[in-house]
Every structure is written in structure tokens, then in C-alpha cells.
Amino acid sequence: MKPLDNLCHPVSVIKDAEMLAAEAFGAKHAFFIVNGTTAAVQTMIFTSCKAGDKIIMPRNVHRSAINALVVCGAIPVYVNPGTNKQLGIPLGMSVKDVEKAIKENPDAKA
């Protein structure tokens, strides 16, 4: 049924939605993943890194990213996320810390 489309090979409404998402995010392409976040995270790492490549990531990264590093052999460059002192929860990486990691690791692939 063409109107319902197929996530594995979009040709109509899903393809249109992916194109709209890419436009909204200022990207060349956007792809909706079929197998959930773990597959999406691992796909991002597998497509951007190979054995020995450095990848900059937060120290509290999801275990799916760690598993991808083990499988592909990429080397993590960890950036410690900030912490919300009032709530005691981790925040994202600061722009300053990411810029520092990039300057210290200009050979990082991602």
C-alpha cells in the first residue's frame, strides 16, 4: 500500500517526511531508522569511524555507543559533561569543552 510507505525503502509519505526533516535540520539528508535508538547510534559510529579513528563523545555516553566502539575499534576521546548542581544530574557537553577536545584532537573523525 503505497500511501502507508515502508521505513526500509521509503518512496512516498515517509520519503517526503525525511526530506522535510532534512530541510528543518539544515542537513543534506535525514533518515528515519527502523531498529530504534541503539541501531541509530551504532550506525552513526560505524559509518563515520573505523579501527584506530578517534571519536569525541561525552563520558556518560549510552552503552550502545561503547558497544559500537568495541566492534569497530574506534578510540573514544571523552569529554566530561557538566552537572546541574541543584538537581545533581549530568548535562550535555559544553561548547567550550567540545572546542577544546577538537583542538587537542584535530585528527578525530567525529
Model-derived features: where do they sit?
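Conserved N-terminal alpha-helix of the aminotransferase class I/II PLP-enzyme fold
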Residues: M1-A39
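Well-ordered alpha-helical segments embedded in enzymatic catalytic cores
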Residues: D16-L20, A39-M44, M93-K100
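Conserved beta-loop-alpha segment that forms the PLP phosphate-binding cup at the N-terminus of a helix
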Residues: K28-I55, A65-A68
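General small-molecule cofactor/ligand-binding pocket signal
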Residues: F31, V77-V79
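A glycine- and small-aliphatic-rich helix-loop capping segment at beta-alpha/alpha-beta transitions
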Residues: T47-A51, G73-V77, E99
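Substrate-binding/gating loop at the entrance of the active-site cleft, primarily
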Residues: M57-P76
